[in-house]
Amino acid sequence: MTFELKHRDRSHLSHHFNAILGNPPVEWKISDHLVEYPEALRYMQERVEKILAKTAHEQVWLLEHPSLYTAGTSADKKDLLAPHLFPVYEAGRGGEFTYHGPGQRIAYIMLDLKRRKQDIRAFISALEEWIIQMLASFNIKGERREDRVGVWVKQSHCPSKKNDLSSEDKIAAIGIRVRKWISFHGVSINVNPNLAHYSGIVPCGITNHGVTSFLNLGCPVTMHDIDIALKHAFEKIFGPTIDVS
């Protein structure tokens, strides 16, 4: 099943998604090269089947993609403004169009919600909280919005928009799919991508807000810095991890 979150309050939901006692640590995998989207999609689908068969453990996979657009299950063709700019892939996840590319940290989340909590709204909220806590470690205040999924930053944080107190932009997008209570797809975090590449789509179907990045906020960080902060915040919400290659 794919998941679409509509206008429903989730701020009160528990953000703790620890597994049942005795569950192995979540594997923490980092790829240091650009991963083609079809390869990543194939890997996730195979991993989900292995988790279902109990022949593989849960995993978080951190990576970057070459520049591309993906279409979620709610994508509207009119929101693809420049169809020939980059390759376009049907993702099968919830959501609409989004951009992936170098300088963006992708975290694919393959967790067994039966071992944790069979509540997809709470899972989305926990993913948002994970990103919010990660951002806080860099003194960036990320916020959730009840009418749209993802993590948002008020542009009073951005040096170029300090006088625009009403503006807010998305720094992290979330799009998941769940198959027999195993999650896949995940989150994308703008570290230092070329934000102009978003001009070929209406990101997530939202026209009245933009996108931002760590670099755009005046916070130049390395991908390694992001990975350390992500791991620390993840373990507080989802439990222990173990590094794998």
Curated annotation (Swiss-Prot):
Coiled coil: none annotated. Gene3D superfamilies: Bira Bifunctional Protein, Domain 2 (3.30.930.10). It is found in: Cytoplasm. The record marks 170 as: Lowers pKa of active site Cys. Transmembrane segments: none annotated. Residues 54-242 form the BPL/LPL catalytic domain. Substrate binds at residues 93-100, 173-175, 186-188. Pathway: Protein modification; protein lipoylation via endogenous pathway; protein N(6)-(lipoyl)lysine from octanoyl-[acyl-carrier-protein]: step 1/2. It catalyses: octanoyl-[ACP] + L-lysyl-[protein] = N(6)-octanoyl-L-lysyl-[protein] + holo-[ACP] + H(+). PROSITE patterns: BPL_LPL_CATALYTIC, LIPB. GO terms for molecular function: lipoyl(octanoyl) transferase activity. It is an enzyme of class 2 (transferase). The keyword Transferase applies. Its main location: cytoplasm. GO terms for biological process: protein modification process. Keywords: Acyltransferase, Cytoplasm, Transferase. InterPro entries: aa-tRNA-synth_II/BPL/LPL, BPL_LPL_catalytic, Octanoyltransferase, Octanoyltransferase_CS. Its EC number is 2.3.1.181. The keyword Hydrolase does not apply. One of its GO terms (cellular component) is cytoplasm. The active site is at 204 (acyl-thioester intermediate). PANTHER family: LIPOYLTRANSFERASE 2, MITOCHONDRIAL-RELATED (PTHR10993:SF7), OCTANOYLTRANSFERASE (PTHR10993). In the reaction, the free carboxyl group of octanoic acid is attached via an amide linkage to the epsilon-amino group of a specific lysine residue of lipoyl domains of lipoate-dependent enzymes. Belongs to the LipB family. Catalyzes the transfer of endogenously produced octanoic acid from octanoyl-acyl-carrier-protein onto the lipoyl domains of lipoate-dependent enzymes. Lipoyl-ACP can also act as a substrate although octanoyl-ACP is likely to be the physiological substrate. This is Octanoyltransferase. It comes from Bartonella tribocorum (strain CIP 105476 / IBS 506).
